[in-house]
Amino acid sequence: MTTQQDYTQDNDKLYRYLFQHRAVRGEWVRLNKTFTDTLNTHQYPKAVQDLLGEMMVATNLLTATLKFDGNITVQIQGDGPLRLALVNGNDQQQIRALARVDGNITENMSLHNMIGKGVLVITIAPKEGERYQGVISLDKPTITECLEDYFVRSEQLQTQLIIRTGEYEGKPVAAGMLLQIMPDGSGTPEDFEHLTTLAATVKDEELFGLPAEELLYRLYHEETVNLYPEQDVQFFCGCSAERSGSALLLISDEEIDEILAEHKGSIDMQCECCGTHYFFNKEAIEKLKSTRV
């Protein structure tokens, strides 16, 4: 039986691995505290929580696959009750997510009913070089299938994406695996099909409750799998009083004075992502203005 100590060693970790004789590479990630921290300050409907979990896992896997310095934003916009779902992650596996809901969303509501008429936008912003943006139609039943199609079309490589969200020992968890044929052309469709068939047998409790090494052994015990050192994953918002103050100064002095008068001399700027409050009185705002000049 797997003990708590066994499985928690790989909570909030991302691993890369390579099949030595198959020319196929893989990634595995599990979000525990990272996912909980994302949800803690919001009362999202269950269907929205699950969608954000899928998008977060996919973003982690995408940043690891592309191997670049910078950040990636995965964003859904629509005209349904879910107006926006957004995830941003970087090459350090720091990730944040938020959603905007305007309407009733039931627990088992489908992706298309939540979003209505919408699109999936992936923005890749390297620290150096040109920014890239891809717009993907939401023509598949799940976001995982839409993203898998994106991987295949954008990189022209056979790719399998498995993402699950749920609970393990009473706590939210999101986890996933990516398999991709090597870009050097040495992999065969037969090798890829063999490995993806095995991966498709993975159970939720295995993804959520096993260390990476044990999970890979269960799935691929007849294969030689090289497992590389893990990378930590964490929730990181990046908000600050300075950024909130800069946003506040985008509105006119007249509007600022009206808000100050309405709210007893203090403006509360709350971060939409992590829920942190930043308070600005007249003196603080004048100081911001002086430093901006």
UniProtKB/Swiss-Prot annotation:
Chief subcellular location: cytoplasm
Keyword Zinc among record annotations: yes
GO biological process: protein refolding
Disulfide bond entries: C237-C239, C271-C274
Record's comment on post-translational modification: Under oxidizing conditions two disulfide bonds are formed involving the reactive cysteines. Under reducing conditions zinc is bound to the reactive cysteines and the protein is inactive.
Gene3D superfamilies: helix hairpin bin, Hsp33 domain, HSP33 redox switch-like
GO MF assignments: protein folding chaperone; unfolded protein binding
Cellular compartments annotated: Cytoplasm
Keywords noted in UniProt: Chaperone, Cytoplasm, Disulfide bond, Redox-active center, Zinc
Name of one Pfam family that matches: HSP33
Gene Ontology terms: cellular component: cytoplasm
Function according to Swiss-Prot or TrEMBL: Redox regulated molecular chaperone. Protects both thermally unfolding and oxidatively damaged proteins from irreversible aggregation. Plays an important role in the bacterial defense system toward oxidative stress.
Similarity comment: family membership: Belongs to the HSP33 family.
PANTHER family with a match to the protein in the record: 33 KDA CHAPERONIN
HAMAP family for this protein: HslO (MF_00117)
Listed name of the protein: 33 kDa chaperonin
Organism listed in the record: Haemophilus influenzae (strain PittEE)
Lineage start: Bacteria, Pseudomonadati, Pseudomonadota, Gammaproteobacteria, Pasteurellales
